[in-house]
């Protein structure tokens, strides 16, 4: 039973790593991360210029193989016909196979992370264009001064819309709030506003 429990724990651990590999793959696709080029790597069979996130793809694949085996182990090992059959010994011989897949995946992840370079320009450009993130700050001030339906008003302004600086500042100018609060809101930018993120991160 303890082996089955251990296998289930490894499945959960591997699933977290799969999520990490997929997220990192996505950030590479978005251009938030660049990868250092290795001269001996083949980019693509048809696109020689391409730098594939191959290490993260390899890690994801190997972790998936490990999880398939571990899930079977966890379901099989507690079950025995009248507590007498020997199918468990066949299964136990393959515990090392699952461990091997995990080891290869970890090596791939470490190799992939070692190649990453942060593309600060791309990240800053996306943040600078995301004026809708300031809806939180505007809504908080609206609530403070008793303006009705602040959430609904900001939702109508921002949801599914391309929010620009001019659109948001026109909305702020229309609010019946003290001039000092208006001025404070108008000076906010997506790059400078972090809300309570700093405090919440430190409270962890």
Feature names for model-found ranges:
Residues 1-76:
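Internal glycine-rich alpha/beta core junctions
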Residues 42-204:
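Catalytic-core signal marking the mid-to-C-terminal active-site face
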């Amino acid at each position: 039973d303890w082996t089955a429990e251990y296998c289930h724990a490894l499945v959960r651990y591997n699933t977290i790593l799969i999520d990490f590999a997929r997220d990192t793959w996505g950030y590479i696709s978005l251009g938030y991360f660049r990868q250092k080029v290795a001269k001996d790597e083949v980019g693509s069979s048809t696109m020689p210029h391409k730098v594939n996130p191959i290490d993260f793809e390899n890690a994801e694949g190997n972790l998936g193989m490990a999880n398939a085996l571990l899930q079977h182990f966890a379901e099989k090992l507690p079950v025995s016909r009248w507590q007498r059959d020997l199918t468990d010994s066949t299964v136990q011989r393959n515990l090392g196979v699952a461990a091997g897949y995990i080891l290869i995946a970890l090596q791939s992840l470490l190799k992939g992370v070692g190649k990453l370079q942060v593309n600060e320009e791309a990240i800053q450009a996306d943040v600078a264009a995301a004026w809708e993130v300031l809806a939180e700050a505007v809504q908080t001030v609206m609530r403070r001064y008793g303006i009705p339906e602040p959430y609904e008003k900001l939702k109508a302004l921002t949801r599914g819309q391309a929010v620009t600086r001019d659109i948001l500042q026109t909305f702020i100018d229309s609010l019946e709030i003290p001039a000092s609060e208006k001025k404070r809101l108008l000076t906010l930018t997506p790059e400078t506003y972090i809300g309570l993120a700093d405090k919440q991160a430190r409270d962890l």
